[in-house]
Structures are given as structure tokens and as C-alpha cells.
Amino acid sequence: MTRTVPRRTFLGLAAAATLVPAQTQTNQEKGREIAQKTIYALGGDGFRFMKTRTESGKAYSFYHDQITGLSPAHIYTTYLPEGAPIRQQQRQNFGKKFDDAVILTASSAWEVTFRGAKPLGDERLKTFIETTLHDIFYILRCRMEEPDLTFEYRGKDVVENSPVETLDIFDSDNRKTTVWIHSTTFLPVKQSFQRWDPAISDRREEVTRYTKYREAGNGVLWPHDTQRERDQSKVFELYADKVTVGDDFKPGLFDLPAGVTVLKK
């Protein structure tokens, strides 16, 4: 026999149910959830497992917000397996013939020209490593499984005229990266971190803005306009005409050319 619940009792039960608080997320849980949504927006497994990336376009350098240099640029990035101290290597080729290069790895930083190969020094290497470890795309691609990596949700905001979700990302070495994620597309809009600069014995704020996301292959979306600021002054912009992922790089691309002359610092 089916029992009918009187209307008043039913309404009372429904009202009581609304008084039971829903289980709320912690700021860390919500922060990591947004990070996972960002990975999905960037291409999901296509993003997580991409092995190489090529960005081709124009690189601009600035001083006091004024353009001081413009060059065609090809930037090659490869990702290394787990266990490497830094799971990313990069070669930046500049010039009309792309014969000027900067090679950056976990252990060395070189400038290669027709004169030879010049070591860029320890500070340039440290800057590359710190910039990489703070980079939101590198964090999402290579660092998500680190046990002490935490995402703290800081609330909603408006950045670049876009609604965003603000996250603070912390690692076990007390690095902090703040990133602003678009509330609708879940693509990174802006990031900021601070690093110590021994040249001025003070901290510098490094800000990067990302726009013009386009398909790069295998379902991956990548920004075609990347702008960097240091202490509120624009210092660099890469405007890519084309970005591709999954290219097969020739062997030795991230090594010094055989027989190259090694110059003094």
C-alpha cells in the first residue's frame, strides 16, 4: 500500500531541507577545481601530454614602455619526462636568418651568434628557472602532481575588461604565483609573481598578460599575444603568427653547435 504524504507535511519537509547547509568547498578545493577546468579549456590531454611547441612571429623589446627592438622570432620549447629538475628546455631564434639564438636548459644559458657561443651567466639561468617555475602553463602542464602544490581561490574580479577568478598558487619552496582565469572560458588572462633581483637588492614584480588564444593543434589552445611587464613597465611582447604543438625537432636543437667557439662571459 502506497502512503501519501500530506501536502502540509511535504511542504514542511521541503522547507526543512532548505535549511540544511549544502556542503561547501574550501578555497583550496575550489582553486584546484578551477585549475582543472583551465587544463580542460587549454586542451585537456592534448595540453597535458604535448611534448613540443613552436611559436613563430615577431618579438618586441621595450625600455620605459618604448620599443627598443623588433625581430622575427622562432621559439622552440620541448618538455622533458618526470624526474628532470626543470621539465622544459627552450631555444629562441632571432634575426632575419634566425641565426642568433638563446638556448635555455636546467643547467645552462647560452647566446649563440656567428661569433660563437657566450655563456649568459648564473643570474640569467636563475631567472629562466624561476620564470619557468612560476609560469601558469608550466604549472598546469608539469607541476600538478607535486604533493605540496596548493591553489587558493581568492574570489572574483575584473581584469582586462573580463570577469575573472583569482587564484594564488603556492609550492613547497614558498613560491607564490597569482593568476587570473577568465570566468567563462577558463583561459589564463594574467599572472604575477615577485622575484629577488640582486642587481638592485630588491624584489621585482613580473606580470604577464595573455590574449588572442587560437588552436595550435591536437585540441590545444595557446595565446598568440604574450606581453610581459616588470615593475609596471612593459619589457617584452611576443606576437605569434603561428603556434604549433607536437612538431618533431631535429636532434641537437637544444645543444651547442659542434665545434662552436666558446666565448668568455
Task: Show where each model-derived region lies.
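N-terminal secretory signal peptides and thylakoid transit peptides that target proteins
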Residues: 1-17
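Short, surface-exposed linear segments at secondary-structure transitions and domain or protein termini
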Residues: 10, 82-87, 108-113, 130-132, ...
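Boundary at the C-terminal end of the N-terminal hydrophobic targeting segment
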Residues: 22-24
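Flexible, processing/modification-adjacent segments and terminal tails
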Residues: 26-33, 106-175, 185, 195-202, ...
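Extracytoplasmic/lumenal soluble domains of exported proteins with redox or metal-associated functions
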Residues: 28-64, 88, 134-137, 157, ...
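N-terminal mature ectodomain segment of secretory-pathway/periplasmic proteins
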Residues: 36-117, 148-152
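Catalytic loop of the DD-peptidase/beta-lactamase superfamily, centered on the K-T-G motif
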Residues: 98-107, 117-118, 126-129, 229-262
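Gly/Pro-enriched, hydrophobic low-complexity segments
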Residues: 160-256
